[in-house]
């Protein structure tokens, strides 16, 4: 079976971690080119040491390389603004190329593998939302498949040391993109996202808190749905886990809570507490926020490549 060759744009924390994952665990994918803009970056140096072709001339440099002719997938781990330009350039040069967007640009549909990958297997560009989105949206979706969700709020706390310049430059885009994906993918009527960069030393693991306000429903059914969803995420992010039991609170009709911009709410409040430990392929285990992004992106591209192989076999 022919593996699909991939290029990664962005030689920072996320791009380098993703490269190592593909080299170690790629089933349908083969690492071909690492693209950066800083010739002194550690990511490009590491790629060269691992036998991967590199360029420090950005997307323009990639498209001038002989390897570009065989590239089927491109992962973009740059920034939201850069991705818009990168996608346009790539698509003009190679209209059928598959682009996995790890920035908050969201040109293509949001993709959270355990929730909606099957519906997006044939998209030319998919957006991996954000680290907070990949961790928390499955939990919102787990509740929404049991009861109608009116409001969901997530708080993602990540170690400051794990946030590179790209993450820091995209804080506003992080909150906007995650909030929208909570609604579009998670199924919430209204979504809100908050990110906290925790400067604690030694660095703490990624922690996520998910609050969901829904119609009254069986607490046992919701807890079971959440446990099932957590296990599905663990299939590609082994360090993903529920930190404690799911907490429930019934909000009675005669004592509703007032949500600014939404109105009064009564029903069921569900609180989910998560911890994400990284696989430590490139950065330490506390950087679960990077690990869940790269793991989700790899799972997405692997399934896309598998679908392409199956389709090619069917038409052969």
Swiss-Prot record:
SMART domains: Semialdhyde_dh (SM00859)
Domain of life (superkingdom): Bacteria
Pathway(s) this gene product operates in, as recorded in its UniProt entry: Aromatic compound metabolism; 3-phenylpropanoate degradation
Known catalytic reactions: acetaldehyde + NAD(+) + CoA = acetyl-CoA + NADH + H(+)
Molecular-function GO term, any one: acetaldehyde dehydrogenase (acetylating) activity
Record carries keyword NAD: yes
SUPFAM superfamilies on file: Glyceraldehyde-3-phosphate dehydrogenase-like, C-terminal domain (SSF55347), NAD(P)-binding Rossmann-fold domains (SSF51735)
Sections of the chain in a coiled coil: none
One record GO biological process: 3-phenylpropionate catabolic process
Xref: InterPro entries: Acetaldehyde_dehydrogenase, Acetylaldehyde_DH_C, NAD(P)-bd_dom_sf, Semialdehyde_DH_NAD-bd
Gene3D superfamilies named among the record's database cross-references: Dihydrodipicolinate Reductase, domain 2 (3.30.360.10), NAD(P)-binding Rossmann-like Domain (3.40.50.720)
Binding site for NAD(+): 11-14, 162-170, 289
Root EC class: oxidoreductase
Subunit-structure text: Interacts with MhpE.
Family label: Belongs to the acetaldehyde dehydrogenase family.
Protein name according to UniProt: Acetaldehyde dehydrogenase
Organism, scientific name: Klebsiella pneumoniae (strain 342)
């Amino acid at each position: 079976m022919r593996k699909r060759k991939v290029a990664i744009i962005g030689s920072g924390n996320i791009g380098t971690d993703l490269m190592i994952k593909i080299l170690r665990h790629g089933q349908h994918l083969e690492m071909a080119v690492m693209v950066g803009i800083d010739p002194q970056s550690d990511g490009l140096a590491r790629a060269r040491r691992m036998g991967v072709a590199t360029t420090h001339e950005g997307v323009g440099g990639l498209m001038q390389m002989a390897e570009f002719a065989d590239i089927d997938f491109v992962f973009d781990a740059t920034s939201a603004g850069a991705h818009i330009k990168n996608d346009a350039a790539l698509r003009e040069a190679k209209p059928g190329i598959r682009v996995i967007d790890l920035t908050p640009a969201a040109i293509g549909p949001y993709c959270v593998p355990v929730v909606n990958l099957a519906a997006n297997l044939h998209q030319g560009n998919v957006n991996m939302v954000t680290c907070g989105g990949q961790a928390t949206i499955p939990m919102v979706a787990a509740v929404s498949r049991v009861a109608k969700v009116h409001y969901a709020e997530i708080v993602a706390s990540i170690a400051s040391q794990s946030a590179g310049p790209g993450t820091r430059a995209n804080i506003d885009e992080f909150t906007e993109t995650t909030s929208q994906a909570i609604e579009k993918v998670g199924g919430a009527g209204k979504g809100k996202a908050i990110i906290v960069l925790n400067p604690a030393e030694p660095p703490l693991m990624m922690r996520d808190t998910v609050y969901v306000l829904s119609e009254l429903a069986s607490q046992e059914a919701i807890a079971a749905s959440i446990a099932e969803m957590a296990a599905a995420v663990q299939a590609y992010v082994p360090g993903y886990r529920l930190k404690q039991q799911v907490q429930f609170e019934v909000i009675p009709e005669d004592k509703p809570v007032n949500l600014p911009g939404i109105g009064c709410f009564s029903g069921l409040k569900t609180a989910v507490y998560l911890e994400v430990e990284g696989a430590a392929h490139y950065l330490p285990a506390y950087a679960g926020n990077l690990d869940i992004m790269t793991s989700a992106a790899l799972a997405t591209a692997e399934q896309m490549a598998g679908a392409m192989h199956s389709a090619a076999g069917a038409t052969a």
